[in-house]
Amino acid sequence: MNKIEMKSNKFKNVISDVNEKLHNYKWEESYKIIINALSENPDAPEPHNLLGLWNEFNKNYDLARKHYRAAYALDPTYKPASINLERVCTMFSSRNVPADFGEVFEKSTKDNTNLKNYNKEKEMKNNDGQ
C-alpha cells in the first residue's frame, strides 16, 4: 500500500468517525478528531469540510463558510465542499439539501457514457420535433 492509499484510507476513517460523532451530538470529541486531522494534513480539503460542518451544526455559519471555501480552494474537485458551500451560502433554495460529509468516495475517472447517451437522445428528439 502506497502513501496516497494510506492517506485516503485514513481520511475515510476520520470522516466516518466524525460523521458518527456529529450525528450523536458528541461535539467535543468530533472537534478534537477534526483538529487532529487538520494538523496532520492542513492541505487536505476533508478536514476543512468537516470543520465547516461542525461550525454549521453549532450555528456558526460564517466560520462554516470559511472552512468550506478553504476546502474548495484546496481542491475544487472535492464535491462535498462545493455542495456544502452552495447550501450554506444560498438563502432559501438549498436549505433542504442535506449536509455532505464526504462519505461517498468517487472514482477519479468518471464514466459519462449514460449522460452522453441521454444528451444524444434528447438532441435527436428535439431535431425530430422541429
Question: PLM features: residue spans?
Answer:
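TPR-adjacent "capping" and linker segments in tetratricopeptide-repeat scaffold/adaptor proteins
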Residues: M1-N13, S39, R95-N96, D100
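Helix-start (N-cap) detector for alpha-helical repeat units in TPR-like alpha-solenoids
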Residues: K10-F11, P45-E46, K79-P80
